[in-house]
Amino acid sequence: MSGLPDHLRRPVRGMRDWLPPQYYALRHMEEVLCKVAESFGYRRVETPVVEHFEVLAKKAGQDVINEIYYFKDKAGRDLGLRFDMTVPVARVLSYNLELPRPVRWYYFTKVFRYDEPQHGRYREFYQFGVELVGSSSPRADAEVIQLLIASLEAAGASNFYVRINDRRAVDKLLEHLGVAPYRDIIYKALDKKLKLPREDVIKIMTGGGVSKEIAEEIYNTATEITIQEAVELLYKLDKALGASYEKIVKYLEASVPMERLKFDMSIVRGLDYYTGIVFEAFVGEYKLAVGGGGRYDDLLELYSGVKTPALGFAIGVERLMEAVGIQNVERPLDYYIYIFDDDAYKYAAAVAKKLRTEGYSVVVELGEKGLKDAFEYALKVGARHIIIIGRKELEKGVIKVRDLEKRIEVEKPLSQFLA
C-alpha cells in the first residue's frame, strides 16, 4: 500500500486537526464566550492572519519576536503570522481614528506562536479576547475584569481566580530598592515565579547583576495578598497609584465576587506593551493559566501617533476547554433514510426536504449498502432514527420510522411529507 509517509499524513508539528466532536466543542465554547462579550456591548472584529513583520515586532520584545512565524512573500515583503489580536487591533484603529471612543471590540480567532509545543498548547491556537480602547478610567479596568470573570463563569469554570498586579507598582518598588536599571531581568524572574522553585527565580536575578539580598526582598514582596491589602501597599509605594487602584477595587467590590481576586506582584505578563494593571486567570485544581491581559496605554501611539489609553484580555480557548473538561460535543444525526431502489428515491428526497425545513439533520442512503449494513452504519454515526421506504411501505402509502434509542417502530403517512 503506497501513499504519503506517516509524518506527512499527520499535522505539522504544533498544529492539530479538529474532528467533528472536537470542533463542535470549540463552536460551543465560541457561542458561550461571544454571547458574554455581546451582553457587555462589545462587537466582534476580525483581521488578516498575515501582518507586516514590522507591525508585529513594534513592541513585542525579543522573546515574542523569536516566536513569530516570519516569512517573505513573492514581492520580498517581510511578513508574519499574528501572535495575538491586540497588535492587529491597534493597527486597525490607527487608521480608523474617527470611530467614537471608547471602542469595545472582541474576537474569537486563530493566532500563531512558534514556541515549544506542550500538552494542551499548540503553535496554532484560538484566542477569545476583548479590547476596550479610548478610556483611562478605573471603571474601564473594572469592566474588563468583570467581563473576564463572567466569561470564565459562563464557560463552566467553578474553581478559578484572577491574580492582579500593576506594573507601575513593581517599577516603584525597584526604584525604592535602587535596582531600576535591572528592570528587564527582574521582570523576567518575576514572570517565572509561579513556575520555578524559589532558588531558580533568585538565581535569574542575581545572574543579571542584582544582589542576593535585594533579590530575596523582591521575591518576598512579590507574594499573594488580598485585593484590599494591596491598596495599602500601593499607597506606600505611590499615593497617586494607590488612589487609582483604590477606585478600581471599589468598582470591583460592587460588581464581582471578591473571593475570585488576589493581588500578586509577580504577575507582570510577558509582553512588553503592558503599562499598568495586569492580570492572569487560573482555573481548576492544577491552577492552569488560561489567559490574562492588562492596560497598554502606549501601544496605539506607536501606530497612529495619537496617545490612546487601552486595555484588554485574551483567553487561550483550548486551555480553557481542557480546564473545564469540554473536549468533545457529539451532534447526533436525526434521521437516516434507507430505500431499496431508485423508484423510492423521489419519496426519500421529499421526506428529507420536509424534515430539513423543520430543522432536523437528514442523510439519504447512497444505494451502496444493504439493510443490515445500513443499520450498522446508522448506529455508528449516532443516528437517532432510521426511516425505511420500501415497496411495501409505498403500496400502503406510509414510511416506517424506527427510533434507535427507544427501539420502537411506527408507521407514518407518506402524504404528510409530500405537502
From Swiss-Prot:
CDD domains per record: HisRS-like_core (cd00773)
Annotated EC: 6.1.1.21
Catalytic activity line of the entry: tRNA(His) + L-histidine + ATP = L-histidyl-tRNA(His) + AMP + diphosphate + H(+)
Protein name: Histidine--tRNA ligase
PROSITE patterns in the cross-refs: AA_TRNA_LIGASE_II
Similarity comment text for this entry: Belongs to the class-II aminoacyl-tRNA synthetase family.
Gene3D superfamilies on file: Anticodon-binding domain, Bira Bifunctional Protein, Domain 2
HAMAP family in alphabetical order: His_tRNA_synth, HisZ
Cellular compartments per GO CC: cytoplasm
Biological processes per GO annotation: histidyl-tRNA aminoacylation; L-histidine biosynthetic process
Alphabetized PANTHER family for the sequence: HISTIDINE--TRNA LIGASE, MITOCHONDRIAL-RELATED, HISTIDYL-TRNA SYNTHETASE
Keywords per UniProt: Aminoacyl-tRNA synthetase, ATP-binding, Cytoplasm, Ligase, Nucleotide-binding, Protein biosynthesis
